[in-house]
Amino acid sequence: MRDSDIMIVVGALLGAAILATGEETGREWKMRHSSSPDRVHFTVESYKGTEHWIFNQDVPLSYFRGLSLDTLDHSGSAHFEYVRDAGRLLCKGAFSWSRGSGSFTFVPNPGFPAELAKLGYDAPNENQLFSLLMHDVSLEFARGVHDAGLNASTNQLEELRIHGVTLDYIRETQRAGYRQFRAKDYVDIKIHGVPGEFLRNLKEAGYDLSAQQVIELRIHGVDSEFMDDLKQAGYELSPAQITELKIHGVDSRFIRDLKSYGLQPKASDLVQFKIHGVSPEFLRELKDAGYGGLSESQITELKIHGVSTEFVRQAVDLGYHFSPQDLTELHIHGVDAGYLRRLRDSGMRNLDAQQIAKLKMHGVD
């Protein structure tokens, strides 16, 4: 059962609560063709007053007795059964113009609760049985969850099915090395769209994470490509550090560009660079100008004050070797490469940054 196919208006588990009331509850079914030739679109509704529960999905024809596509395509009365491990829906009504509707009666499977109990689950009551039937909780599924060691309750079996957790997904996750996950963990990681490949890549990268840590990475857009790029660039980071990088916009392209320029700033520096708009190109050009050994604070200070790499390179070409602080101070006072060139050409050489700044401040041009 795919969770995208299930619409729950007041919550799947609330459906059981609605049925549990002593008041009369309406139960109706509707049917039409599906886009798949071996399925029909089957809707089951249960309602009372303003409370409304609806099950809505494409269902294999094999789940029905006494129903065929030919029956659906011909007008007339409808009598068929929807049969699953937890029980049956006895449906009656009418078909017309390839659509059908009517009412149903739920008939529980009396042996199903006992079989669940043998596996260690709480025996469901009739209302729970109806909900288990609608979410297709089979004995095979219950047995697989039990054998996987998830320690699930009867209600959690239903939650697993609602959110699309399959036995194949559980097996794939456990093969990837996550044998500590329990039923709630599987529901949570499935809600956040964590694929088995991502879990496997985390393990291969040496990360042994809890479900919540995995989810935190996923929420902030960390994918396998980003993890691999970090690893290839030589970064061994904690999940919290990786998350922080993503939060501040450090992406795979940024990491790859740094690597292509032969640069590997510290992880904390990466965050500051992103915050202040320091690009890999800016770092490379500083390095090419002879400023490859600057600290993160020195680099960000240059960027904050608008010191361009062109000015840095031109100053070097003119024979100046200013400190990062000098470059910032000169830029603040409006000193550009043209001013430095005019000083040199006028014979004023071997001046330090403070002297040049004072000349500029006093209007010597």
Feature-to-residue mapping (PLM):
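General marker for long, soluble alpha-helical cores
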Residues: 2-5, 18-365
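Bacterial N-terminal signal peptides
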Residues: 10-17
